[in-house]
Every structure is written in structure tokens, then in C-alpha cells.
From Swiss-Prot:
Species this protein is from: Cereibacter sphaeroides (strain ATCC 17029 / ATH 2.4.9) (Rhodobacter sphaeroides)
A single GO cellular-component term on record: cytosol
This protein's name: Leucine--tRNA ligase
Entry's family note: Belongs to the class-I aminoacyl-tRNA synthetase family.
Metal-binding listed as a keyword: no
List of residues binding ATP: 622
SUPFAM superfamilies given in the database record: Anticodon-binding domain of a subclass of class I aminoacyl-tRNA synthetases, Nucleotidylyl transferase, ValRS/IleRS/LeuRS editing domain
Top-rank EC class of the record's enzyme: ligase
Chain positions of motif 'HIGH' region: 41-51
Localization terms from the record: Cytoplasm
Length: 847
């Protein structure tokens, strides 16, 4: 009997697939297409089990769709620009390009042994000049379409990475990569007009039926549509040019509870006061040490500076409110100015309490009297409340009704207008770093800002740069920076900012349709392959990458690079769970944790016998060393074992805990399948009565595995394959029936364990490669059960069940029921008073 040896067989089948060009995507108008894509990785240098799970999911889908007759596009590339490469250059010497391409080579070498059905001929990295040159061409097209602009802006500045961060890249007030506290700084920045699409991006979420509801909700909240009132306070004693203070509020129904007005430190009025008042300047400088994101402002201590200025209430000019500069007001949301109603906003309540300002309730819960508030009363807008200082609508109404009535009333009185605003702000893409896509514009003293001529693209990054000091090396590279104006030929200066790396990943899915085209996309190829039918990646990308990609698809459609049908680029989205592992640690003399790799721990002890603390499973982390190297698993068990385990142990949307015992169990099962196939390949039994039962079991396996794979219930598909293996091993059917079933088994398990499937397919005489075989179809007639299981009740209590042919006569069923041991015990030798057979449903025995 031969022995299953993954190390010897897996590479052989991978070579066979490559030689046959099995996974080369083919534009075939005669066949339906299917585009499956996993979010491409950053080339850190090592793949991890999370990568294995993610890419195996996509591979299962791609292989099954190809077998089902689709022309499949399943590409791979590298999200290759970014700070880690520059950091590596600074820490270790060398060049970011060498570090990046070296890591790509290492990761490709680790991924290929997994046997993924990837069309490697379409591979690219975003740091390839051929890729970012097309990105530069699109940037110029977007400039011409009015989707790009440049302005001075207060930005989040990372003082360690020395670059600007988008609000989404500020986590808990710190840079998402460096972890350094961000500060506010004013710089001239390039922006994409994503806010122009806010309403469309929000509304279109309802069309994404095959996206997780959680992702759609996260995007809706980030876009943040609100309906409110925009109006102007008149100012008392204001500096010249500031006689009105424009305010936006989502709660105009609380105007009669106003006790102060507040402006952003970046508001024009605050800027004016800053130039003329040292105390204001000091306060504003303090405010700028907090990031610009809402999250950073929310967590900072709320502080204000009384300017001494006053505004007049729009309904009572004798009623004046103090004007504060407040550190929690955003300049680029609304108008950068608000009025505070402390009774109905907790932030305003804390501010008013701190500065001794009045707190006047506007509404109360129904059937309550006005009393001093210990905290703000902030009911849901859908809740009915009693307005005691209302000015529009009913005395008792919901907050939603109160807001609508207040807007209508204010508009009728000439106090402002109803406005729809969005939380989503324009996307600042300027980054002060080297390892990114150069922004293709030139600054000329005569012509101003001029786009680079397209025939000069790509604007390549220079190789001869130094990272011996922080900051952007492009600023210190005169032969690259200094150039001539493409418009007038005069001396000019190249833009030294590079693009946010999220730009690179916002359109790569479109480039895969024609990765060698001389334009960003090829119209014919994009029309055939777009949209991505199935996109797979982590939910951590719900806002940044996925929202930016949706915007970019619209921008590409507007500039002629994508067809209208691709305005939503991803038809279906699946967000997979993580791969987790226990954490092993000991402690040093100071009690600090010292982490250990799983392979260094056996039965809870290190090699020297030292016991370890075991922390329950958590996300795999290099710092905590609870990582499993996929290459070790492949060397020990084979790629198919790794693939089988990450697919089998948990629903794919949930986390899966990697355990050595689980991997061993997966390996044992695959060895069992091999032995079963080897045994069946040598069987010679005659056809017999059990052949039909095995054919029916095979049909059920086809139906249920297909349903599991197509429904992303891979664990259920694998559970059915376990069951089918047991059925086949116990079957007494003849040799041909068993061989037929085993060949079907090879086809069904091919998406999950493709190497073993090829071995089994070849062993059982399958024609060609199973990777090129058509997906099996279940005979509908074999899916119809010809038996039925009937529960037996005696005096209303269930006593057992009986399985009988569906067409068995009631009289024959009665005989079998009366012969049942449980029924005989209940009867105690007596005859039943009544025996009722409800065909196909139940049998009732009355004693």
C-alpha cells in the first residue's frame, strides 16, 4: 500500500497546474465571468495564518466557480508603499525599494506552496513605476475634472513619522503606525473632493445587499448625514468684519435653552483674535496640540476661552450669549461655530458647569416637573417629550418632530435655513514622505500649479536618497526637486509631497483587469471583468479602504476609466474572522512578561522544564509571539492540512483558534482519505443492492457541499465531506459505485485540499486534472427521499420512531408499530384502543 506524502506530491501538482496554465484568466465572452479578490497584502516579509485563511477562502471560491463553468479572475499583488519601508531604511540602512522588493520575493515564495489558484501573470506592486505612473495619470484627469484641489488646512501631524495623517489614521489621538500623539499644524495640502459624493455614497449603501450590515452601518455613521438649521447670530462689540456669527445646529428646537456660543480655534474670528491678544494666542496654541479628529477632540479635556464678545439671540436681541473659543469644535464640520444648550448635550453640560453658565431645560420627560439637572437630558429623537421652552410644534412631540417644526418656524421668520450636512470631509492625500506615489504637479512662479505633461509620466522616485535625518528626502534632493515648467519652460520646483497609500489601494482592483495596459484601465477588459464579484478582507477596512474605493470608482467613471456599471466596484463583500492562538509567557525578575513561541512550548513547559503561563487565545501578534509560521505547518503536515484546518474549525466570519491538536486531526483525516482512495482504487467487488444507497449519498454530498461553498459556510461543506468519508468507508457497494463516489469526493474537496484531490482523482482514473474538471451536479431524482421517519406517540407521549418506505400502506405501518419494543412495553400485552397513522407525519397509539 502506498503512503501519502504531501511534501513529495504538492509541488508536483503545482508544477502541473502551471504547465497547463490552469489559473490564467481568460477573457471569454462565451462564458460567464467571475472575479474573486482578497485584499492584497502589505509586503512585511512574512505571511501568517491570517493570510492563509483569507487567501484560502478566496481560493475555494475561485476553484469552485472555475469548475462550475465561469471564466475566473483571481489575481494577487502588493500594497507596497508606506512608512515601514522608510523606517526600515532608517533603522537598518539600505533602501526602501530593496527592502520592499526583497519582502515581496519572500512572501511570494511563501504563498506559492499553498497551491492558490492565482493568475500570477497579473501580479504587480503599487511601488512599480508602471503602476504609480497610471495613478499619476488619473490624478491629472481628476484635477481636470475638478475632483482635486489644494488649500491650506489644519492637519494631523505625526511628529515621529513627520507626516500628515488623515483623521481615520488617528487612533486614540495617536498616529496609527508610530503611536505618537498627533498635533495640529497648518500646511498646504492636496485634497480629493470625496465630500461631493457624500449623499450618493450614503444612499448607494442600500444597494449593497451582499455586504455585511455592520460594514454598511459603519460607513453610514462615518458619512454622517444630519439635517439641521444654519443661521447667524448678530454680534455685539465685534471686530470689524465680524458682525455676524454663522452657526449650524442639528437641534434648533433647543434654541431657547442656549447659554453660550463657541467657535473653533481655527475659526476666522479666533484667528483674528489670536493675532491681537497674547492670551488668546496661548490658548489656541494649546488647542493645536490636540489632533483634528473627532475622536481626539472627544477624549481631550473640554476647555474654553471667553473672548469677551457677545452674540444676540435671534428671538430676543436683549438676550446676549458669551462667545468662547472651545477646543472641541471642528472648523471643517458645519460652520466651525455652535451654540451650546447644556441641558440637552452632555459635552455642553460639562462645559457650562465648568464655566458657571446657565442650564435651561427646553424639554422634559412626559409628566415630570422642572428640576435642577444632575446631567444632560438626551433622549432618543424618536422619544416623545414635553417642551417647556419650545417655540414650534406641539407641546408634547418627539425630538424629530420638534426639529422639523423648529426648522420650518425659523425659515418662516427669516432666521436661517434648513441644511443637510455630512460628517464626511474631503480626503487630504498629501504625505511628507519619500516612499509613496509622487504627486505629478510642478510649481512655477509664472504659471502657478501646473500638472506634469502626461508624456513625462511616470514621475519616478529618485533612487539616490538618504534617510540619515527625519523628514522627506525629496525636499533635500535638488536634482529631482528642481525642474522646468512644462507650460512655459522656466525654472520650477516639483511637488515633493507623495500620495497617501490609501490612494494606491483604492483602484488596484480595476488595474488587475488589464495590468499591462498603457492607460489606467483597458475599456474592453474593464467592461468584461468588472465588477469584483466577491471581495474578501477584514472588517478593520470598513471605513478607510472600502469607502475610499467606492469614491475612486466614481471618480474613475467620471474620468472615463471605468464603465458606469462599476460605480460600486464590489458586488459582494465578506469579512473573515481572525486566526487566534494561546499566549505563552514566563516572567523576569521584575515580574515583566517574557513571551514564547508556540513551537518552544510542549505540554505547558519550555525545553528546560520551566512552566509557562497560558493566556486564552487572542489575535496572533508578533510582539506576544503567539504566531504560527505557516511554512512550519506546510513542512510538517503539508499545505492541504493548513488549508483544511482554517476552513473547517469555525464559520468563516468568526475567529478560528489555531491548535496543534486541531492541525494534527486535520492531517489524520486527509491521510485517512488517501488510504480510503487507495483501497477503493484496488477494489473489485460486484455491483449490488447498496450501489443505489451510495449514489443517493453522493448526490446529497454534492448538493450540500455546493450549498456550503456558495453560501460561504465552508465549515459546513467540510463537515459534509467528513460525513461522506464515513459513508463511503462503511459502504458495501460494488467497486464501480465506490470508485464513482470517490472521484466525486475528489471533485468536492478540490477547492479546499487541491493537491490531495489531484492524487485521489488520478488514483481513481479521473481524466486530466481535477482542477480542470467540471463541478459535479446532483441528480435531482436521487435527492428525493423514498423513506420517511415517523414519530410514535403512545397516549400523547413520544415513545420512539420508525422509518418506512414513503408509499407503505397504513395497515403495514400498523404491523411494524405494534412490533416495536417500546410500544409493546407500553401496551403490557394488551391491545390498543386505537391506532392512528397520519401518512408522512406521525403514528398515535391510544391505550
Amino acid at each position: 500500500m502506498s503512503r501519502y506524502d504531501p511534501a513529495a506530491t504538492e509541488s508536483r501538482w503545482q508544477a502541473a497546474w502551471d504547465a497547463a496554465g490552469v489559473f490564467t484568466a481568460r477573457h471569454d465572452p462565451a462564458r460567464p465571468k467571475y472575479y474573486v479578490l482578497e485584499m492584497f497584502p502589505y509586503p512585511s516579509g512574512r505571511i501568517h495564518m491570517g493570510h492563509v485563511r483569507n487567501y484560502t477562502m478566496g481560493d475555494v471560491v475561485a476553484r469552485q466557480k472555475a469548475a462550475a463553468g465561469f471564466s475566473v479572475l483571481h489575481p494577487m499583488g502588493w500594497d507596497a508603499f508606506g512608512m515601514p519601508a522608510e523606517n526600515a531604511a532608517m533603522e537598518r540602512g539600505g533602501h526602501p525599494k530593496d527592502w520592499t522588493y526583497g519582502n515581496i520575493a519572500d512572501m511570494r515564495a511563501q504563498m506559492k506552496p499553498l497551491g492558490l489558484s492565482i493568475d500570477w501573470s497579473r501580479e504587480f506592486a503599487t511601488c512599480d513605476p508602471e503602476y504609480y505612473g497610471q495613478q499619476q495619470a488619473m490624478f491629472i484627469d481628476m484635477m481636470e475634472a475638478g475632483l482635486v484641489y489644494r488649500k491650506n488646512a489644519v492637519v494631523n501631524w505625526d511628529p515621529v513619522d513627520m507626516t500628515v495623517l488623515a483623521n481615520e489614521q488617528v487612533i486614540d489621538g495617536k498616529g496609527w503606525r508610530s503611536g505618537a500623539p498627533v498635533v495640529r499644524r497648518e500646511l498646504t495640502q492636496w485634497f480629493f473632493r470625496i465630500s461631493d459624493y457624500a449623499g450618493e455614497l450614503l444612499e448607494a449603501l442600500d444597494t449593497l445587499k451582499d455586504w455585511p450590515e455592520k460594514v454598511r452601518l459603519m460607513q453610514a455613521n462615518w458619512i454622517g448625514q444630519s439635517r439641521g438649521l444654519q443661521f447667524a447670530f448678530s454680534m455685539a462689540g465685534a471686530p470689524e468684519g465680524f458682525d455676524r456669527l454663522e452657526v449650524y445646529t442639528t437641534r434648533p428646537d433647543t434654541l431657547m435653552g442656549a447659554s453660550f456660543a463657541a467657535i473653533s480655534p481655527d475659526h476666522p474670528l479666533a484667528r483674528h483674535l489670536e493675532r491681537h491678544d497674547a492670551e488668546v494666542a496661548e490658548f489656541v496654541a494649546e488647542c493645536r496640540r490636540v489632533g483634528t479628529s473627532e475622536e481626539a477632540l472627544e477624549k481631550a479635556e473640554k476647555k474654553g476661552f471667553d473672548t469677551g464678545l457677545r452674540v444676540r439671540h435671534p428671538f430676543d436681541t436683549a438676550w446676549e450669549l458669551p462667545v468662547y473659543i472651545a477646543n472641541f469644535i471642528l472648523m471643517d464640520y458645519g460652520t466651525g461655530a455652535i451654540f451650546g444648550c447644556p441641558a440637552h448635550d452632555q459635552r455642553d453640560f460639562e462645559f457650562a458647569t465648568k464655566y458657571g453658565l446657565p442650564i435651561r431645560p427646553v424639554f422634559l420627560p412626559e409628566d415630570t416637573e422642572e428640576t435642577a439637572l444632575a446631567e444632560a437630558f438626551v433622549p432618543m429623537k424618536s422619544e416623545r417629550v414635553h417642551y417647556i421652552r419650545g417655540f414650534a410644534g406641539a407641546e408634547v412631540q418627539t425630538g424629530e418632530e420638534g426639529v422639523a417644526a423648529a426648522i420650518d418656524f425659523c425659515e418662516s421668520q427669516g432666521v436661517g435655513r434648513g441644511v443637510t450636512n455630512y460628517r464626511l470631509r474631503d480626503w487630504g492625500i498629501s504625505r511628507q514622505r519619500y516612499w509613496g506615489c509622487p504627486i505629478p504637479v510642478i510649481h512655477c512662479e509664472t504659471c502657478g500649479v501646473v500638472p506634469e505633461a502626461k508624456e513625462n509620466l511616470p514621475v519616478r522616485l529618485p533612487d539616490d536618497v538618504s534617510f540619515d535625518v527625519p523628514g522627506n528626502p525629496l525636499d533635500r534632493h535638488p536634482t529631482w526637486r528642481d525642474c522646468t515648467c512644462p507650460k512655459c519652460g522656466a525654472k520650477a520646483r516639483r511637488e515633493t509631497d507623495t500620495m497617501d497609500t490609501f490612494v494606491d489601494s483604492s483602484w488596484y482592483y480595476a488595474r488587475f483587469t488589464a495590468p499591462r495596459a498603457a492607460t489606467p484601465t483597458d475599456a474592453e477588459e474593464a467592461d468584461y471583468w468588472m465588477n469584483v464579484d466577491q471581495y474578501i478582507g477584514g472588517i478593520e477596512h470598513a471605513i478607510l479602504h472600502l469607502l475610499y474605493s467606492r469614491f475612486f470608482a466614481r471618480a474613475m467613471q467620471k474620468t472615463g476609466h471605468l464603465p458606469a456599471k462599476a460605480i460600486e466596484p464590489f458586488n459582494a463583500l465578506f469579512t473573515q474572522g481572525m486566526v487566534t492562538h494561546e499566549i505563552y509567557l514566563t516572567r523576569d525578575a521584575a515580574g515583566r512578561p517574557v513571551y514564547h513561541l508556540p513551537e518552544d512550548v510542549t505540554d505547558g513547559r519550555l525545553a528546560d522544564g520551566t512552566p509557562v503561563e497560558i493566556i486564552p487565545s487572542a489575535k496572533m501578534s508578533k510582539s506576544k509571539k503567539n504566531v504560527v509560521d505557516p511554512m512550519n505547518i506546510i513542512r510538517q503536515f503539508g499545505a492541504d492540512t493548513a488549508r483544511w484546518f482554517v476552513m473547517s474549525d469555525s464559520p468563516p466570519e468568526r475567529d478560528v483558534e489555531w491548535t496543534a491538536s486541531g492541525a494534527e486531526a486535520a492531517s489524520k483525516h486527509l491521510h485517512r482519505v488517501w488510504r480510503l482512495a487507495d483501497e477503493i482504487s484496488r477494489a473489485d467487488g460486484e455491483a449490488n443492492a447498496e450501489d443505489g444507497a451510495l449514489d443517493k449519498a453522493t448526490a446529497r454530498a454534492i448538493a450540500e457541499v455546493t450549498q456550503g461553498v456558495e453560501g460561504f459556510a465552508f465549515n459546513k461543506a467540510i463537515a459534509k465531506l467528513y460525513e461522506f468519508t464515513n459513508t463511503l468507508s462503511r459502504s458495501g457497494a460494488g467497486a464501480e459505485a465506490k470508485k464513482r463516489a470517490m472521484r466525486t469526493m475528489a471533485q468536492l474537496m478540490s477547492p479546499m485540499v487541491p493537491h490531495l484531490a489531484e492524487e485521489v482523482w488520478a488514483m481513481l482514473g479521473g481524466e486530466g486534472l481535477v482542477a480542470q474538471a467540471a463541478w459535479p451536479k446532483a441528480d435531482p431524482a436521487l435527492l428525493i427521499d423514498d423513506t420517511v421517519t415517523l414519530p410514535i406517540q403512545v397516549n400523547g407521549k413520544r415513545r420512539g420512531e420508525i422509518t418506512v418506505p414513503k408509499e407503505m400502506a397504513a395497515s403495514e405501518v400498523e404491523k411494524l408499530v405494534l412490533a416495536d419494543e417500546a410500544v409493546q412495553r407500553a401496551l403490557g400485552g394488551a391491545a390498543p384502543k386505537k391506532l392512528i397513522v397520519v401518512p408522512g407525519r406521525i403514528v398515535n397509539v391510544v391505550i
